[in-house]
Swiss-Prot record:
PANTHER family: SERINE/THREONINE-PROTEIN KINASE TNNI3K-RELATED, V-MOS MOLONEY MURINE SARCOMA VIRAL ONCO HOMOLOG. ATP binds at L8, G9, S10, G11, G12, F13, G14, S15, V16, K29. The lineage of its organism: Eukaryota, Metazoa, Chordata, Craniata, Vertebrata. Its EC number is 2.7.11.1. This is Serine/threonine-protein kinase mos. It catalyses: L-seryl-[protein] + ATP = O-phospho-L-seryl-[protein] + ADP + H(+); L-threonyl-[protein] + ATP = O-phospho-L-threonyl-[protein] + ADP + H(+).
Length: 200
């Protein structure tokens, strides 16, 4: 039912692969067991499932998840998500990754076109729409950065990588430290940096 095709990338808590699941192309994240910080690894896996039942055009959809994995994989579990490609907003802004946005009107002198005002507005609207939806579901993404915004072939931005997210119970959080082990320090929410509780 699940067949891994090729690696797409890896991060602090696991690896992501392009795969097929029941014949459909998907992305598969295998959350690795961390010998140094098992609690953080577990938190990352369960945080990814905060969006498991949500469907929104600007949020990467979780298709399925399992905690069953062969011992040889050293994995806490597997998360199967919709495949949205491997281009992120980081690639678009900084011109990294695959040959992206190659063009003749190279404004920066580095072999890529600058984002147009129209693209900038469209991407911003997609991200804000996705965030507003997540907040309406009491979910806070605690590692929102260009590398976690995926851009589809149709040019739609989707928020992904929820390994450092939090579901606010009854609109409040009593644990500001939930994801301080993970996430990107330079993109961390101000309230986390101050040691305050997470807000939406």
């Amino acid at each position: 039912q699940l067949c891994l095709l090729q690696p797409l990338g890896s991060g602090g808590f696991g690896s992501v692969y392009k795969a097929t699941y029941h014949g459909a192309t998907v992305a598969v994240k295998q959350v690795k067991k961390s010998s140094k910080n098992r609690l953080a690894s577990r938190q990352s896996f369960w945080a990814e499932l905060n969006v498991a039942r949500l469907q929104h055009n600007n949020v990467v959809r979780v298709v399925a998840a399992s905690t069953c994995a062969p011992a040889s994989q050293n994995s806490l579990g597997t998360i199967i998500m919709e495949y949205v490609g491997n281009i992120t907003l980081h690639h678009v802004i900084y011109g990294t990754g695959d040959a992206w946005r190659q063009g003749e009107d190279d404004e920066g002198g580095c072999g890529r076109k600058a984002l147009s005002m129209e693209e900038t507005v469209c991407y911003s609207c997609d991200i804000m729409t996705g965030l507003a939806f997540l907040h309406s579901q009491d979910i806070v993404h605690l590692d929102l950065k260009p590398a976690n915004i995926f851009i589809t072939e149709q040019g739609v931005c989707k928020i992904g990588d929820f390994g450092c997210s939090q579901k606010l119970e009854e609109g409040l959080s009593q644990s500001p430290h939930v994801c301080q082990q993970g996430g990107t320090y330079t993109h961390r929410a101000p309230e986390l940096l101050k040691g305050e509780r997470v807000t939406a």
